[in-house]
C-alpha cells in the first residue's frame, strides 16, 4: 500500500507551492478523442477549473494562475476564438456569485485592449466584486503573453520616468500584470508538451516544471496531488549550492 496516493491527506506534503501556474493544454484532443467539436473540450476544460480550484484550496495553494487565452490564440479559427470569449463571459455570469461566496479573489493578467468592451466590463466587475476575498487568488491569464507583459511593463517604466539606476528586479516585478503576486513556484502543463509557450516567463524563472500527458479536462485532484508530490521531491536551489554537512 506504500505507493497508494492518499489525496485525502494534504498533510503528507511537507511543502506546498504558494503560487501554481497551469497551462491547460489538451482540450481539443480530449474532444477529438470523443468525436466532439473542439469547443466541447474547452467547455469540459472550464468545468475542470472548478474542480482543481477546490482541490487547490484543500491543499493550501494560495495563488492559481491559469492560462486561458494567449495573445497567440487569436490566430485560431474565428469560431473557436469567439467560442472561447463566450465561454469566459458565460462562466463569469454563471459562477461569479458562487466564487465570491467561496472567498475566491479573481485577478486578470493580460491586455484588456483587444477584448470586446462588454467582456471587458464583465471582467472588471468580477475583479471589483471579489477584490477583498482571501481564500485563494484565481489569476486568469486571458489575452496574455509573457513577452507582451514585459513589453507593457517596460513602456510603463519609461512613461513613469524611472531612472535606470533605480530599476531593480523587485520594482520591475511590480509593473507586471501580476504586480504584487509572488513568483510562480510550480508550473504544471497538461497535454504532454514540454514548452512554456510564453507563459509567466518572468515569474517562472525559478519555478519547478511538471508536465503530464493527461489532457486538461481529465486532470483531477489525484493528478494534482501527483504534481505536488513531485514538487516535494525537487530540491530548489535558486542558483545556489546547498550547504554541505
Ligand atoms: C489548450 O487546449 C487550451 C486553451 C486554448 C485554453 C484553455 C481554455 C480553457 C480551459 C477554456 C477557457 C477558459 C476560460 C476561463 C473561459 P488546446 O485547444 O490547445 O488543445 P489541443 O492541444 O489538444 O488542441
What residue ranges belong to the model's regions?
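Flexible, compositionally biased loop and terminal segments
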Residues: 1-245
Amino acid at each position: 500500500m506504500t505507493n497508494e496516493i492518499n489525496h485525502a491527506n494534504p498533510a503528507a506534503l511537507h511543502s506546498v507551492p504558494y503560487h501554481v501556474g497551469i497551462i491547460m493544454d489538451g482540450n481539443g484532443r480530449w474532444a477529438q478523442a470523443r468525436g466532439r467539436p473542439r469547443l466541447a473540450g474547452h467547455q469540459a476544460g472550464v468545468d475542470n477549473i472548478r474542480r482543481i480550484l477546490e482541490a487547490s484550496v484543500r491543499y493550501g495553494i494560495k495563488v492559481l494562475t491559469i492560462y486561458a487565452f494567449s495573445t497567440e490564440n487569436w490566430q485560431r479559427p474565428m469560431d473557436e476564438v469567439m467560442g472561447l470569449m463566450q465561454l469566459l463571459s458565460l462562466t463569469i455570469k454563471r459562477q461569479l456569485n458562487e466564487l465570491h461566496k467561496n472567498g475566491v479573489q479573481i485577478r486578470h493578467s493580460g491586455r484588456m485592449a483587444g477584448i470586446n468592451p462588454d467582456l471587458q466590463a464583465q471582467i472588471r466587475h468580477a475583479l471589483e466584486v471579489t477584490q477583498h476575498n482571501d481564500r485563494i487568488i484565481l489569476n486568469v491569464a486571458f489575452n496574455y503573453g509573457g513577452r507582451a507583459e514585459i513589453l507593457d511593463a517596460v513602456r510603463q517604466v519609461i512613461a513613469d520616468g524611472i531612472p535606470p539606476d533605480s530599476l531593480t528586479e523587485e520594482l520591475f516585478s511590480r509593473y507586471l500584470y501580476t504586480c504584487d503576486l509572488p513568483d510562480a513556484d510550480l508550473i504544471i502543463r497538461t497535454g504532454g508538451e514540454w514548452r512554456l509557450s510564453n507563459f509567466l516567463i518572468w515569474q517562472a524563472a525559478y519555478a519547478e516544471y511538471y508536465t503530464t500527458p493527461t489532457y486538461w479536462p481529465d486532470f483531477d485532484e489525484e493528478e494534482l496531488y501527483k504534481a505536488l508530490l513531485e514538487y516535494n521531491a525537487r530540491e530548489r536551489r535558486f542558483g545556489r549550492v546547498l550547504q554541505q554537512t
